[in-house]
Protein backbone atom coordinates (compact mmCIF):
# COMPACT_ATOMS: atom_id res chain seq x y z
CA UNK A 1 0.00 0.00 0.00
CA UNK A 2 2.78 2.56 0.78
CA UNK A 3 4.29 1.95 -2.68
CA UNK A 4 0.91 2.53 -4.32
CA UNK A 5 0.35 5.68 -2.24
CA UNK A 6 3.78 7.08 -3.09
CA UNK A 7 3.15 6.31 -6.78
CA UNK A 8 -0.16 8.17 -6.63
CA UNK A 9 1.47 11.13 -4.87
CA UNK A 10 4.25 11.18 -7.47
CA UNK A 11 1.68 11.08 -10.29
CA UNK A 12 -0.33 13.89 -8.68
CA UNK A 13 2.79 16.04 -8.19
CA UNK A 14 3.83 15.37 -11.78
CA UNK A 15 0.36 16.34 -13.06
CA UNK A 16 0.46 19.55 -11.00
CA UNK A 17 3.86 20.43 -12.49
CA UNK A 18 2.38 20.01 -15.98
CA UNK A 19 -0.84 21.93 -15.31
CA UNK A 20 -2.92 22.32 -18.47
CA UNK A 21 -2.41 25.51 -20.42
CA UNK A 22 -5.49 27.67 -20.70
CA UNK A 23 -6.81 29.99 -23.37
CA UNK A 24 -6.59 33.73 -22.64
CA UNK A 25 -9.38 35.07 -20.45
CA UNK A 26 -12.39 36.41 -22.32
CA UNK A 27 -14.21 39.39 -20.82
CA UNK A 28 -17.58 38.37 -19.35
CA UNK A 29 -19.18 41.20 -21.35
CA UNK A 30 -18.15 39.51 -24.63
CA UNK A 31 -20.72 36.74 -24.17
CA UNK A 32 -18.20 34.30 -25.71
CA UNK A 33 -17.05 30.91 -24.45
CA UNK A 34 -13.77 29.14 -25.29
CA UNK A 35 -13.55 25.58 -26.50
CA UNK A 36 -9.99 24.45 -25.90
CA UNK A 37 -7.97 21.72 -27.60
CA UNK A 38 -4.48 20.96 -26.29
CA UNK A 39 -2.02 19.02 -28.44
CA UNK A 40 1.63 18.20 -27.79
CA UNK A 41 2.97 21.26 -29.63
CA UNK A 42 0.03 23.66 -29.90
CA UNK A 43 -3.10 24.95 -28.22
CA UNK A 44 -6.29 25.80 -30.13
CA UNK A 45 -8.87 28.12 -28.60
CA UNK A 46 -12.22 28.58 -30.35
CA UNK A 47 -14.52 31.35 -29.13
CA UNK A 48 -18.22 30.78 -29.74
CA UNK A 49 -21.36 32.81 -29.11
CA UNK A 50 -24.15 31.56 -26.84
CA UNK A 51 -25.87 30.02 -29.89
CA UNK A 52 -22.71 28.06 -30.79
CA UNK A 53 -21.46 30.19 -33.71
CA UNK A 54 -17.63 30.23 -33.81
CA UNK A 55 -16.42 33.81 -34.21
CA UNK A 56 -12.71 33.61 -33.33
CA UNK A 57 -10.04 30.94 -33.34
CA UNK A 58 -6.59 31.25 -31.85
CA UNK A 59 -3.75 28.77 -32.23
CA UNK A 60 -0.66 29.17 -30.06
CA UNK A 61 2.34 27.20 -31.25
CA UNK A 62 6.10 26.89 -31.14
CA UNK A 63 6.13 26.46 -34.92
CA UNK A 64 5.55 29.08 -37.58
CA UNK A 65 2.27 28.04 -39.27
CA UNK A 66 3.76 29.22 -42.61
CA UNK A 67 0.48 30.64 -43.89
CA UNK A 68 1.12 32.86 -46.91
CA UNK A 69 -0.41 36.27 -46.20
CA UNK A 70 -0.55 38.19 -49.47
CA UNK A 71 -0.02 41.94 -49.28
CA UNK A 72 -2.90 42.35 -51.76
CA UNK A 73 -5.23 40.87 -49.10
CA UNK A 74 -3.89 43.12 -46.30
CA UNK A 75 -6.59 45.09 -44.51
CA UNK A 76 -6.46 46.71 -41.05
CA UNK A 77 -3.45 47.38 -38.83
CA UNK A 78 -3.71 45.99 -35.31
CA UNK A 79 -1.82 44.40 -32.46
CA UNK A 80 -1.86 41.11 -30.58
CA UNK A 81 0.17 39.98 -27.59
CA UNK A 82 1.96 43.33 -27.58
CA UNK A 83 3.14 42.91 -31.19
CA UNK A 84 2.09 45.06 -34.16
CA UNK A 85 0.44 43.16 -36.98
CA UNK A 86 -1.93 43.39 -39.93
CA UNK A 87 -5.23 41.65 -40.49
CA UNK A 88 -5.68 39.93 -43.85
CA UNK A 89 -8.61 38.58 -45.77
CA UNK A 90 -8.06 34.82 -46.01
CA UNK A 91 -6.91 33.44 -49.35
CA UNK A 92 -9.68 31.04 -50.34
CA UNK A 93 -8.48 30.50 -53.90
CA UNK A 94 -10.81 33.12 -55.36
CA UNK A 95 -13.91 31.81 -53.58
CA UNK A 96 -15.94 34.35 -51.63
CA UNK A 97 -18.48 32.53 -49.44
CA UNK A 98 -21.10 34.51 -47.49
CA UNK A 99 -19.40 36.70 -44.89
CA UNK A 100 -16.02 36.59 -46.68
CA UNK A 101 -15.66 40.40 -46.72
CA UNK A 102 -15.51 40.49 -42.91
CA UNK A 103 -13.33 37.41 -42.32
CA UNK A 104 -9.80 38.10 -41.14
CA UNK A 105 -6.66 36.11 -40.38
CA UNK A 106 -3.20 36.93 -39.08
CA UNK A 107 -0.05 35.26 -37.81
CA UNK A 108 2.01 36.96 -35.13
CA UNK A 109 5.50 35.99 -34.02
CA UNK A 110 5.34 36.68 -30.29
CA UNK A 111 9.00 35.96 -29.58
CA UNK A 112 11.57 33.30 -30.41
CA UNK A 113 9.69 30.06 -30.96
CA UNK A 114 6.22 31.40 -30.09
CA UNK A 115 3.55 32.08 -32.69
CA UNK A 116 -0.13 33.01 -32.64
CA UNK A 117 -2.46 32.38 -35.55
CA UNK A 118 -5.75 34.28 -35.20
CA UNK A 119 -8.84 33.96 -37.40
CA UNK A 120 -12.04 35.99 -37.13
CA UNK A 121 -15.44 34.84 -38.44
CA UNK A 122 -17.73 37.80 -37.71
CA UNK A 123 -21.33 38.08 -38.82
CA UNK A 124 -21.04 41.81 -39.61
CA UNK A 125 -18.56 44.67 -40.03
CA UNK A 126 -19.48 45.89 -36.53
CA UNK A 127 -18.78 42.46 -35.03
CA UNK A 128 -15.46 42.34 -36.92
CA UNK A 129 -14.38 45.57 -35.21
CA UNK A 130 -15.43 44.22 -31.81
CA UNK A 131 -13.50 40.98 -32.37
CA UNK A 132 -10.39 42.88 -33.47
CA UNK A 133 -10.60 44.96 -30.28
CA UNK A 134 -11.10 41.79 -28.24
CA UNK A 135 -8.03 40.16 -29.83
CA UNK A 136 -5.96 43.30 -29.29
CA UNK A 137 -6.81 43.31 -25.58
CA UNK A 138 -6.10 39.62 -24.94
CA UNK A 139 -3.50 38.99 -22.29
CA UNK A 140 -1.42 35.94 -23.11
CA UNK A 141 -0.20 33.76 -20.29
CA UNK A 142 3.60 33.57 -20.75
CA UNK A 143 3.43 29.80 -20.33
CA UNK A 144 0.73 29.46 -23.01
CA UNK A 145 3.34 28.23 -25.44
CA UNK A 146 5.65 26.60 -22.91
CA UNK A 147 8.20 24.01 -23.92
CA UNK A 148 6.47 20.90 -25.16
CA UNK A 149 3.23 22.75 -25.92
Give the residues covered by each predicted segment.
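Bacterial N-terminal signal peptides that target proteins for export
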Residues: 1-8
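Surface-exposed amphipathic alpha-helical segments
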Residues: 26-33, 116-149
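A mature extracytoplasmic/lumenal domain signature
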Residues: 38, 62, 89-92, 120-124
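Signature of long, low-cysteine stretches enriched in small and polar/charged residues
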Residues: 71-115, 121
Amino acid sequence: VPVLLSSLLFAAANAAAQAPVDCPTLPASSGLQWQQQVQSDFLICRASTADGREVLSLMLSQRDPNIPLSRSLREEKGSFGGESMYWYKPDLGGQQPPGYAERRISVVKLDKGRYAQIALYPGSTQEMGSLQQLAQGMSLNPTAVADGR
